[in-house]
């Protein structure tokens, strides 16, 4: 890895963000998902929930359990998860395929109820979340590893976190909110020189952010 740029060359000889070359799982996630602009409500809900489950853990741990989470939480259909009852909490606490943390499980159910309220108000979760695409002035002029390391949270992620908490969401601190923004394409945080950066920039350029219904 080049320390200044944060780039590393994978077994396929492609330059990637340093974290995206650690394992085959990470490479696929980095190359095919991370930073692609997303407007699908279930995927948005899934991601913000999984970011909450990640708190205190590595993303690779969550990524390797993602299919188990999808099975356990009805593919993160928030209309279905919002109807979960205590028996579902008890069931999930016995599920070794997921992170068995009562607070995070109960938070996911609570957030599903709050997601339904957002859908009613904005027409979709996508319309709500894409309001928080940050202004260009908040973005670094050149994105190397040092610049990326300074972006654990930003004014926009702080604003998103505050607004979600005001609306009753939990496990949505500003660092979690920024990781969500990175993954769902509200920002392009592939480093300069990463083979995926230009492709993500093109996808973002062609993307029309949903608006409030």
Model regions and ranges:
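HhH-family (HhH-GPD) DNA N-glycosylase catalytic core used in base-excision repair
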Residues: 1-213
């Amino acid at each position: 890895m080049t320390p200044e740029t944060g780039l590393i060359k994978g077994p396929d000889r492609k330059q990637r963000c340093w974290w995206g070359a650690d394992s085959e799982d990470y490479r696929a996630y980095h190359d095919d998902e991370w930073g692609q602009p997303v407007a699908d409500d279930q995927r948005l809900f899934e991601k913000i929930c999984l970011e909450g489950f990640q708190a205190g853990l590595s993303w690779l741990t969550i990524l390797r359990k993602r299919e188990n989470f999808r099975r356990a939480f009805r593919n993160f259909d928030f209309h279905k998860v919002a109807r979960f009852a205590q028996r579902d909490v008890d069931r999930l606490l016995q599920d070794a395929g997921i992170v068995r943390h009562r607070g995070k499980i109960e938070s996911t159910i609570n957030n599903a109820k709050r997601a339904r309220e957002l859908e009613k108000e904005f027409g979709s979760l996508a319309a709500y979340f894409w309001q928080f695409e940050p202004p260009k002035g908040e973005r670094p002029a050149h994105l190397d590893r040092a610049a990326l390391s300074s972006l654990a949270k930003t004014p926009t992620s702080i604003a998103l976190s505050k607004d979600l908490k005001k609306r009753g969401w939990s496990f949505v601190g500003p660092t979690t909110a920024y990781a969500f923004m990175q993954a769902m394409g509200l920002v392009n945080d592939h480093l300069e020189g990463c083979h995926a950066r230009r492709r993500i920039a093109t996808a973002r350029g062609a993307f029309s952010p949903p608006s409030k219904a």
